[in-house]
Structures are given as structure tokens and as C-alpha cells.
């Protein structure tokens, strides 16, 4: 929970869940068709989804003095985006622009469980590794190939798995 959503009421009566006039209300999708009355990640009510295309939310995250700006100026080296492949490419590009605005040396890493170089999601080819999005991804296919080899799987299998992600 957070002061922005405030489902549990830990932050008084404000927040999008408790106050229909909250400035954060438009960040979320409230509808009785959803479990709990709002859209949440994979139906987990403790993980309300935000609308990454909402202009005020985008500004809150990427704008001057926003989340990205604040943490990087306080010394963070960069950010890791959880389930980056479920974020819109435009939003990732805006996050990257905010990161690089602070310093070109700051880093944006994405969690993508599959081969990110060939990733299709929601009916389209993902573009986050084409220069305007992520600096890198967590390479789980490579990690799995190496671990399988170390655990005794045939070297040829590891080689084929690694070559499948080398394009």
C-alpha cells in the first residue's frame, strides 16, 4: 500500500482507493468487473496496477523533481524495472530519458525472463533493447544455460541454448 493508493487506510482518508476526488485516482482503473474493484497485477489485490500512459503518473515518475530525478540525484546508480516486458515501450523510453537527463552514466536494467532480443508481448515486437529503452536486461536464458551445464547437462545443450540467444 502507499499514500497514493491507500487501500488499507494507513494514510488517513486520502489516496485513490479511499477518495474518489484524489489527484491519484486517474492513475488506477477502478471498475466492479475487477476483483477488489480495481485492476491489479495478475489479480493480486495487494498489487494495484497503475496506468503507465496517464500523463500525471508519467510526470510523477519521469518529470523534473519526480521519482527518477529524486533518487538519482540522491546517489542511486540507476534503476531495475521489475517485469519490464509488461510496461509500455513508450513509458520505458520516458524513464530512460529521465535517467539519462541526470547523467548518461546512470543505468536502466529490465527484468525480462525470456530472450529480450526477440521478445513479443501483447501482439507486438518489443523495442526496449533498440537504443531508446533499457541499457540491459537480466539475461535469464544465459544464466539457465550456464547453470544447467554446471549441474551436469551436456555441453552441447548449453552451447545450443547460448547460441540461440546470440543474434
Predicted features, each with a name:
Residues 1-44, 80, 85-119, 137-140:
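Acidic/aromatic-lined carbohydrate-recognition and catalytic surfaces
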Residues 6-14, 67-68, 72, 96-167:
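Conserved alpha/beta catalytic core and glycan-binding cleft of carbohydrate-active enzymes
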Residues 18-25, 51-55, 124-129:
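Short N-terminal helix-initiation segments at or just after the protein's N-terminus
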Residues 27-33, 58-65, 77, 128-131, ...:
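Short, functional N-terminal and low-complexity linear motifs
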Residues 28, 35-39, 49, 70-73, ...:
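A generic structural signal for ordered alpha-helices
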Residues 35, 39-55, 160, 164-167:
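Alpha-helix-centered segments that form part of catalytic cores
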Amino acid at each position: 500500500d502507499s499514500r497514493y493508493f491507500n487501500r488499507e487506510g494507513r494514510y488517513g482518508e486520502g489516496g485513490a482507493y479511499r477518495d474518489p476526488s484524489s489527484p491519484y485516482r486517474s492513475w488506477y482503473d477502478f471498475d466492479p468487473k475487477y476483483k477488489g474493484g480495481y485492476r491489479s497485477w495478475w489479480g493480486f489485490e495487494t498489487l494495484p496496477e497503475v496506468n503507465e500512459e496517464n500523463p500525471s503518473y508519467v510526470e510523477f515518475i519521469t518529470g523534473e523533481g519526480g521519482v527518477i530525478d529524486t533518487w538519482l540525484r540522491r546517489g542511486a546508480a540507476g534503476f531495475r524495472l521489475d517485469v519490464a516486458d509488461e510496461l509500455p515501450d513508450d513509458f520505458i523510453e520516458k524513464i530512460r530519458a529521465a535517467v539519462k537527463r541526470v547523467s548518461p552514466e546512470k543505468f536502466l536494467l529490465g527484468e525480462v525472463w525470456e530472450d529480450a532480443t526477440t521478445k513479443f508481448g501483447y501482439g507486438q515486437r518489443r523495442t526496449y533493447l533498440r537504443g531508446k529503452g533499457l541499457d540491459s536486461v537480466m539475461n535469464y536464458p544465459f544464466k539457465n544455460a550456464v547453470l544447467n551445464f554446471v549441474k551436469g547437462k551436456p555441453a552441447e545443450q548449453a552451447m545450443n541454448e547460448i547460441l540461440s540467444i546470440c543474434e
